[in-house]
């Protein structure tokens, strides 16, 4: 055996052998139960950073553990490779996005292989390749056929830096999710998916093992609210409409309406604005278009508006109500119109105070004295100034007012959602082309399935303007109508890259299949994903879209399940000097350098040891060095000669107890994904074994069996050194094809326990006792303890509480 462990040499040797043997190739023919382990695939930015490793390594450890537990594990890998960065690189460096992307794929593939993960490389997918995006386009056509894809003109989020449209989910605090530039609004013809059709299903996570914070974020994103749609009478000579509808969650306050506010984008604004108010209204609309939705909805921003000059009539009491416009109202939510009840809504109260609008109290607090309110009253109370509902508790009034409105044809109960349809159009080149054409005679026509994929042209001119480069490529744009054979033009927008990642987990089940997006038989075997790991930042984007996509495919009869991921786990982040790593801060840790310095296994073990996986931890170079030294000590433990002397029964019992306790702890902790304590337990075991080895009191057979068990538990954490140690023990290749060790409860029991003795809950003594002590013996020993007796003098024991094997609490008075 080698005297000193050489991680780089050993790791390269085993990685090459595993690859040559296709050790981690997953087959559907296995008699074992399946386990689909998946980590969110990386975007092809060019280099893996330590955050990628932190996402992959613990997930790989668990996948390896499941393999040893007898599961048929599939752990595929691929690359999310369409997107704006590639196009920006093309503009900046004068390189084609395809070349830039595939160069990055090659580098990242090399880096991923150094992780030593049990990736099944036969299943690799790359979303920018035609053999993949052909099926992305096929899914678009299926959604179109099902009425779930449509084209409409709508105000959209626009990033002036990226020169691209953003979905609502891609605007974070009023800025672009990618470059953090403040976004604005534009009106464009866009393609949408009717994700709102699935609002109720998407807020329901029953049967899923997902973090509560993610399910809460998705429920809040759907934003389901119950209320009423109420119509106010409109009598305006310049509008043929005879009413304006509002959505309200407070129908019990209908008698307190003193104004109405329309969104600046509301289609009635232009029609109802009087000539004398037109200039002010137009100026306000222009100003509002420079604000993002986040800014418009901000609770810290002062609410303002402009009067249109027109009134509507509140039908329940005949009151005339002025109609204003205000940018805090969004056309995309509800009806784009809200009723103002300043007495019972804080926002409306501030608006009314600012513009000297009336405040009418219609819900009375118990101590109400009839005086004007100084602040909005938003709690429960009794209705007043409310016609036939005076004296009615407002909690009952909500239902009664809804019934009253419905009886008179003035309104109805309704449910509203904050969720908007998914905007998928992008005015960029590097994405999957939308497979639609425009014919003057036939209108909008889908590309026939037989003509897929619609390929991206190679000869494009990249520009930094806000229009797709495809728009200026005549060879791409000009085509033939599939219906009439006449001249037609292709859609020049490409799809949101989240479209590609909404189904990649399905493709992994049969990536080489060419008769459809996946082989139905293999899909049925592998799906759904058993454990999906990745960042929480994808809660209302990738994770949300993937669930919609899966449910839509189910309803189309393409698949027979409605949820893609059974269990979801979000890892934390690794920080440096308490700061998130970034190039600008100069604190990015590059895995390539670490592997060259200490080897893959040391990096793997340290990442799992640094902190709870869901919380992350602080990167520390000295900690990594310490992990490297520990692996060297493990190597020495195995390779330094052991010559047993006279076997000791006591030492043998201690060895078995320590070993079986460790098997139990590691098994339970790894099942809970507590990898930091798994590594800690391995360290403790190695220290215990080193001490026992010095006694030379363990038989050669037991020592050999112990080392085998240790290697098996080490294998998921540090697979390379474990494989080498296993081979050095003369065991059958490969350690990763063996069975996980089991523990014996009897052997794991302590012979001696530490019993805590309390008097009235205060610690008075710790006693070393035999592990099998009875309750009566424990109580008697506690009462007779020399340290306890002084605390019992002059007092009468009321009761003695015994917690088996842990504590005796004597209650006295």
Swiss-Prot record:
Residue span of motif 'KMSKS' region: 580-584
Main location group: cytoplasm
Cellular component per GO, a single term: cytosol
Pfam families noted in UniProt: Anticodon_1, tRNA-synt_1, tRNA-synt_1_2, tRNA-synt_1g
Domain of life: Bacteria
Subcellular location: Cytoplasm
Motif mapping: 'HIGH' region: 42-52
Any single GO BP term: leucyl-tRNA aminoacylation
Reaction it catalyzes: tRNA(Leu) + L-leucine + ATP = L-leucyl-tRNA(Leu) + AMP + diphosphate
Record-linked InterPro entries: aa-tRNA-synth_Ia (IPR002300), Leu-tRNA-ligase (IPR002302), Leu_tRNA-synth_edit (IPR025709), M/V/L/I-tRNA-synth_anticd-bd (IPR013155), Methionyl/Leucyl_tRNA_Synth (IPR015413), Rossmann-like_a/b/a_fold (IPR014729), tRNAsynth_Ia_anticodon-bd (IPR009080), Val/Leu/Ile-tRNA-synth_edit (IPR009008)
EC number(s) reported in the record: 6.1.1.4
Residue positions binding ATP: 583
NCBIfam families in alphabetical order: leuS_bact (TIGR00396)
Family, as annotated: Belongs to the class-I aminoacyl-tRNA synthetase family.
PANTHER family the record matches: LEUCINE--TRNA LIGASE, MITOCHONDRIAL (PTHR43740:SF2), LEUCYL-TRNA SYNTHETASE (PTHR43740)
This protein's name: Leucine--tRNA ligase
Gene encoding the protein: leuS
């Amino acid at each position: 055996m080698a005297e000193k462990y050489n991680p780089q040499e050993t790791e390269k040797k085993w990685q090459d052998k595993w690859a040559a043997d296709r050790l981690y190739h997953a087959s559907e023919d296995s008699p074992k139960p399946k386990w689909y382990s998946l980590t969110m695939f990386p975007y092809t930015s060019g280099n893996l950073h330590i955050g990628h490793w932190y996402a992959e390594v613990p997930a790989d450890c668990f996948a390896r553990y499941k393999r040893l537990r007898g599961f048929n594990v599939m752990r595929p890998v691929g690359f999310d490779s369409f997107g704006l960065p590639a196009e920006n690189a093309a503009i900046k460096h004068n390189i084609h996005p395809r070349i830039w992307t595939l160069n990055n794929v090659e580098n990242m593939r090399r880096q991923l292989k150094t992780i030593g993960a049990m990736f099944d490389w036969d299943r690799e997918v790359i979303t920018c390749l035609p053999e993949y995006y052909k099926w992305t386009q096929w899914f678009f056509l299926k959604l179109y056929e099902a009425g779930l894809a449509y084209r409409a003109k709508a105000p959209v989020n626009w990033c002036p830096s990226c020169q691209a449209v953003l979905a609502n989910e891609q605007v974070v605090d009023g800025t672009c999710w990618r470059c953090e530039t403040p976004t604005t609004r534009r009106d464009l013809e866009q393609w949408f998916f009717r994700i709102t059709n699935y609002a109720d299903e998407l807020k329901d996570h029953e049967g899923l093992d997902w973090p509560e914070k993610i399910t809460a974020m998705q429920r809040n994103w759907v934003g389901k609210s119950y209320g009423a749609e109420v119509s106010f009478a409109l009598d305006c000579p310049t509008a043929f409409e005879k009413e304006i509808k509002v959505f309200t969650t407070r129908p019990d306050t209908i008698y307190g309406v003193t104004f109405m506010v329309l969104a600046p984008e509301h289609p009635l604004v232009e029609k109802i604005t009087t000539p004398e108010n037109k200039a002010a209204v137009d100026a306000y609309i222009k100003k509002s278009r420079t604000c993002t939705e986040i800014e418009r909805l901000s609770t810290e921003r002062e609410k303002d508006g402009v009067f249109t000059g027109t009134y509507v009539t509140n039908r329940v009491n005949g009151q005339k109500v002025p109609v204003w416009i205000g940018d805090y109202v969004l056309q995309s939510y509800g009806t784009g119109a809200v009723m103002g009840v300043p007495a019972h809504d804080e926002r409306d109260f501030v608006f009314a105070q600012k513009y000297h609008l009336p405040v009418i109290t219609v819900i009375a607090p118990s101590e109400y004295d009839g005086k004007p309110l100084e602040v909005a009253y938003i709690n429960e109370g009794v209705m007043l100034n409310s016609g036939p509902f005076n004296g009615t508790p407002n909690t009952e009034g909500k239902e009664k007012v809804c019934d009253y409105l419905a009886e008179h044809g003035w309104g109805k109960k309704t449910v509203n959602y904050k969720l908007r349809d998914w905007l998928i159009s992008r005015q960029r080149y590097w994405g999957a082309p939308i497979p639609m054409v425009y014919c003057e005679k036939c209108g909008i026509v889908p590309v026939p399935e037989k003509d897929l994929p619609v390929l991206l042209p190679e000869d494009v001119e990249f520009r930094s303007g806000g229009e797709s480069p495809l728009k200026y490529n005549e060879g791409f744009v000009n085509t033939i109508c599939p219906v009439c054979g006449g001249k037609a033009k292709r859609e020049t927008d490409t799809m949101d890259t989240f479209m590609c990642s909404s189904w990649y987990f399905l493709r992994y089940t049969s990536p080489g299949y060419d008769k459809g997006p996946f082989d139905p038989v293999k899909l049925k075997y592998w799906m759904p994903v058993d454990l999906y790991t990745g960042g929480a930042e994808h809660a209302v984007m990738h994770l949300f879209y993937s669930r919609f996509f899966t449910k839509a495919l189910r309803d189309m009869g393409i698949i027979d399940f409605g949820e893609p991921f059974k269990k979801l786990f979000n890892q934390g982040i690794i920080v440096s000097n308490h700061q998130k790593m970034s190039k600008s801060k100069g604190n990015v840790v590059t895995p390539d350098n670490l592997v060259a310095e200490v080897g893959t296994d040391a990096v793997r073990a340290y990442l799992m040891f640094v902190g709870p996986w869901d919380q992350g931890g602080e990167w520390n170079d000295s900690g990594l060095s310490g992990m490297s030294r520990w692996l060297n000590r493990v190597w020495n433990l195995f390779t330094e000669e052991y010559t047993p002397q006279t076997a000791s029964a006591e030492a043998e019992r201690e060895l078995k107890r320590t070993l079986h306790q460790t098997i139990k702890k590691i098994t339970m902790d790894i099942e809970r994904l507590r990898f930091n304590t798994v590594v800690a337990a391995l360290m403790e075991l190695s220290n215990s074994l080193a001490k026992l080895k010095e006694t030379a009191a363990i038989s050669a057979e037991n020592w050999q069996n112990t080392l085998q068990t240790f290697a098996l538990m080490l294998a998921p954490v540090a697979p390379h050194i474990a494989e080498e140690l296993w081979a050095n023990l003369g065991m059958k290749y490969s350690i990763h094809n063996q069975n996980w060790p089991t523990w014996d409860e009897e052997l794991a029991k302590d012979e001696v326990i530490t019993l805590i003795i309390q008097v009235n809950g205060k610690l008075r003594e710790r006693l070393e006792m035999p592990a099998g002590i009875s309750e009566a013996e424990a109580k008697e020993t506690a009462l007779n303890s020399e340290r306890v007796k002084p605390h019992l003098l002059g007092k009468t024991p009321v009761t003695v509480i015994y917690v088996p094997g842990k504590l005796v609490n004597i209650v006295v008075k």
